[in-house]
Amino acid sequence: MGSNLSPQLCLMPFILGLLSGGVTTTPWSLARPQGSCSLEGVEIKGGSFRLLQEGQALEYVCPSGFYPYPVQTRTCRSTGSWSTLKTQDQKTVRKAECRAIHCPRPHDFENGEYWPRSPYYNVSDEISFHCYDGYTLRGSANRTCQVNGRWSGQTAICDNGAGYCSNPGIPIGTRKVGSQYRLEDSVTYHCSRGLTLRGSQRRTCQEGGSWSGTEPSCQDSFMYDTPQEVAEAFLSSLTETIEGVDAEDGHGPGEQQKRKIVLDPSGSMNIYLVLDGSDSIGASNFTGAKKCLVNLIEKVASYGVKPRYGLVTYATYPKIWVKVSDPDSSNADWVTKQLNEINYEDHKLKSGTNTKKALQAVYSMMSWPDDVPPEGWNRTRHVIILMTDGLHNMGGDPITVIDEIRDLLYIGKDHKNPREDYLDVYVFGVGPLVNQVNINALASKKDNEQHVFKVKDMENLEDVFYQMIDESQSLSLCGMVWEHRKGTDYHKQPWQAKISVIRPSKGHESCMGAVVSEYFVLTAAHCFTVDDKEHSIKVSVGGEKRDLEIEVVLFHPNYNINGKKEAGIPEFYDYDVALIKLKNKLKYGQTIRPICLPCTEGTTRALRLPPTTTCQQQKEELLPAQDIKALFVSEEEKKLTRKEVYIKNGDKKGSCERDAQYAPGYDKVKDISEVVTPRFLCTGGVSPYADPNTCRGDSGGPLIVHKRSRFIQVGVISWGVVDVCKNQKRQKQVPAHARDFHINLFQVLPWLKEKLQDEDLGFL
């Protein structure tokens, strides 16, 4: 850096149904029920409780590894007493207690043995399976009892291949009736008293050797799906649906392709989001679910996917906010706007729970007038995301509408072509009050897929959302981040690189940079001198402590910090950009990902622009002639933070650039364009807002435009007029002429394109 100036070293869609199971929590010590039920004597030994539904119900809460016995929830009855504590065999218990979670034992295991045998298994206990001679083991040979009361792995099955269909197995905890696996033979499953069956109770051997329905399991009330389980199961199922759509267009998507498919806007896939807004949900949970859906739609769109959306909320009556037939129903921005305008109070006056009516609204969007099906109706796949606690209290059984929808779409009528792939109904429930029987009845049941989910709380559902959208096949997409509450600095800024140059007897230089490909980091040229050796340059990414080996530093050929000394300009920062080439290829992950560069195919997709978009059109989108909201990343007290600034690219541009004369060494420059060339972008000042300024260690870092949930680098931080961090701390009060200047990447594109030509960035 210069000595006088202050250069600043600085699918496929993934859809999620989000809904609370009617939980409005209140610490028991702070509130009493609004009803007449006393809190005296309701305590649980070894745990605590919290009130739900404004005190009309309560939930017992136990430490991890324990469950509430004999029940998880109690309701306040009209008699003024809490519901009785009864065991699964209807015996009355005087006081609730927390008991250790056990995993169920296998009731039966066909054609093999398991060990050890026990009436129950504690958390972390293991069980092993092996088959008799002549039988082959499918599934997991070893399984571990998990903290949620479920076994790890897959159902162990011993099969000799003699049946037309393979042995469907006996999931641990279930009982199976039927041992013949010929074509059209059926088996049925049952659970012990007090447990709820999830999945298919009856499965039939179908033509082709597959079983109808989905594998069953027996659920206790305290059991929840973990975020990881939900993310993996839902993503796997939905990806199958997307790949089916793509295959009909003659494509065979690879792992990378299937997340870049732009579906036919005429309706290759319709997605119906159905949100329960009834009284049992509560305003805060409704708002939280709505916010998550907004983020979800944004994320789906950020992958370049364009399904048509239908959007329904309901209580006593449904309200259709978006129809799949609306001209803009595949426009994520428009759909998001409609969702943002929905209020929980829209259903306040009639707040029953009529799930049947809501599904009838979906049916009306699927159906066609005059019973004349439109062209291509039989190629459109339909995905319903139903967000409900399953506690419908009016309107009748909603499963009848699912049957009508199946009939409309001609599903299950022809055994040779059952068309099951053309309808997927996913049901999500959150919290302890979910009716597991009802939500299981509504969900689709497909072999090797899961369509019904129950998670513990909204926080867990948020985890599901982030785990699903951030799976490994999207890691190479530029400008993506993991904006999760548990995310580290580098989850939220995965492109950020820290650069240090060690100079013997001269100390060290600190800079920032941005990962732009698997081999390159983009930074400022002034961070280095001609005497710096590669071994003295340290680069770290992803918050890792190890330094990356450097192969070479590539400077822009027109950069020359001493280029105008004879003209009385001590330091000249035009073309202040450099690329650091790494010796070894970066391994992308959640904390190491590339930022988007202008005029690349990746940025076209990120901005959701047509494939024919030109570089000039990208520039107009990212850098219009006005004040442009942008950000940079700074390190304060060893923590990365985003700083919001405005690029002055409109009527304030001239005054911003003129303030460069206040920089040390530039006070005698008569023509400011001698130092502020067309290659610079200007931020800082107090209008339209007081912008934060960069510090010395920020130099070389990216100036970023955040648009449509993606981050696009438009500049490289170069130099500033005022050193606002003289005493290792950013000053709060700075003069209005405190400006920062950044190299405009649109102005150095030929050089970037030349040096990054082998990085598969798809420059336009």
From Swiss-Prot:
GO terms for molecular function: serine-type endopeptidase activity. Pfam families: Sushi (PF00084), Trypsin (PF00089), VWA (PF00092). It is found in: Secreted. CDD domains: CCP (cd00033), Tryp_SPc (cd00190), vWA_complement_factors (cd01470). Its main location: secreted. Glycans are attached at residues 122, 142, 285, 378. The active site is at residues 526, 576, 699. Disulfide bonds join 37-76, 62-98, 103-145, 131-158, 165-205, 191-218, 478-596, 511-527, 599-615, 656-682, 695-725. The keyword Signal applies. InterPro entries: Compl_C2_B, Peptidase_S1_PA, Peptidase_S1A, Sushi/SCR/CCP_sf, Sushi_SCR_CCP_dom, Trypsin_dom, TRYPSIN_HIS, TRYPSIN_SER. GO terms for cellular component: extracellular region. Residues 35-100, 101-160, 163-220 form the Sushi domain. GO terms for biological process: complement activation; complement activation, alternative pathway; proteolysis; response to bacterium. The record marks 259-260 as: Cleavage. Cleaved by CFD following activation of the alternative complement system, generating Ba and Bb chains. Cleavage and activation takes place when CFB is already associated with complement C3b. Keywords: Cleavage on pair of basic residues, Complement alternate pathway, Disulfide bond, Glycoprotein, Hydrolase, Immunity, Innate immunity, Magnesium, Metal-binding, Protease, Repeat, Secreted, Serine protease, Signal, Sushi, Zymogen. Residues 477-757 form the Peptidase S1 domain. Its EC number is 3.4.21.47. Residues 1-25 form the signal peptide. Belongs to the peptidase S1 family. The unliganded VWA domain has an inactive 'locked' conformation whereby the scissile Arg-259|Lys-260 bond is protected from proteolytic activation. Monomer. Interacts with complement C3b; this interaction is dependent on the presence of Mg(2+). This is Complement factor B. The lineage of its organism: Eukaryota, Metazoa, Chordata, Craniata, Vertebrata.
